[in-house]
Amino acid sequence: RLLESHGFSVAILAQPDWKNPDSFKIFGKPRLAFLVSSGAMDSMVSNYTANNKPRSEDAYAHGGEKGHRPDRALTTYVGAIRQAYKGTNIIIGGIEASLRRFSHYDYWSNTVKRSILLDSKADLLIYGMGERAIIEIANQLKDGKSAREIRNVRGTCWYTGKESDIAALQNSTNMSFPDTANLSFPTSTDLSFPYSTRESCEHKDYRVDPLIKPEDDNELLDSDNDTFDKKQFIHLPSFEEVKNNSPESKQKYALSYLIQEQNTDAINADILIEKTDSRFVVQNPPAMPLSTEEMDKIYSLPFTRKWHPMYDKLAANGKSGIPALSEVKFSLTSCRGCFGACSFCAITFHQGRRIQSRSHNSLVEEATKMTKDKDFKGYIHDVGGPTANFRNDACENQKINGACKNKDCLGVNPCKNVKVSHTDYVELLQKLRSIPNVKKVFIRSGIRFDYLMMDKDKTFFTELCKHHISGQLKVAPEHVNDN
């Protein structure tokens, strides 16, 4: 829908038959690129249990029938596209691409795998929530660039086999930002920030090459060069160094992930480089967070809340549709991002720690439209996001300097600067409850209850218990065990 709103035509090929390259030719060769995702869940998580046993069903496939999505779906899909159309642009994105963008431990094979950008042989990878990146990339493709030539967009990873390309980064810090004025997105000028000196991720064996002279570090941006980003150039441990099972290799793997985790904020993240054999994977800094106005505009686009019609034609065992849709069809996304820092969770790596939220009017309008759906029974299943009760940034400092690299907002010793308030969320829930034909508004996203307990105003807790629990309170599971 976002691409359509910018004048691009999009054909959706839903869950193609990966065993038959001709199934990727249904719509012909795209003018600009194939945009490939494995869906809302990593394909290995979708296909296997934690005990490495095949799952009996796939809630994201037609009729819930298993076997319609391949293992390591992105790599398989890209390979099939390459067979069907040699030389076409292929860009990967979504949760599987985001979480596997560098060398990563793969639970199912019990090995460290290379970046999925290299394994899949795609041309470009979009990580995180890709609205800004995809519009900028589409515009550059329209202007005649190939996907392999696009190296200056936030929220993307690219690769090269030339050391000279890596060396050239030291002389090129002009990051290009999407100009999406048609959606009231900020222009590149609005997205520029002056960067001040800060502690970097310097470690003994891995160099951090400054892309600017130290004496220039505190200068304000030149008004004629508003996209000039003062970034550093950090070399991660190479794939060769992290792939083995030795203690030294594991330490370097942990170090690599630490550096990656410290560079998930759009304001203070640096450019990360990982060498694999003779190639280099380069991660540009994350896309800038969306403003409330931008979030509202995106969620006002004409989404249907229905599965792709192709799934009706592929009905399995007399069943059609996507079972997973029933859980979210009448839910509202009120926010993105999370500063909870749960050690097991990948949200920060995908959406970042900054909270991006929609306005009350936007959510009320969407809820009102839902009440007119013939399948709506009066129940809004969820109003939330990664963490339901986060509606604003953790502190004012995040808006200026980004989330702290070496300090968590919550945890055993919460930061004293965390602003605790549920007032905005309470007012939003009250407005949603008052909409005609709405019987109940439930919260099924996780409640971060240590944050809740920090709030001296108990209004939200009272409202939560009286109006918004559908059987059991949903909480973040990292708090249930003292160990």
What are these regions (language model features)?
Residues L3, A315-A346, Y379, Q472:
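N-terminal pre-triad scaffold of radical SAM enzymes
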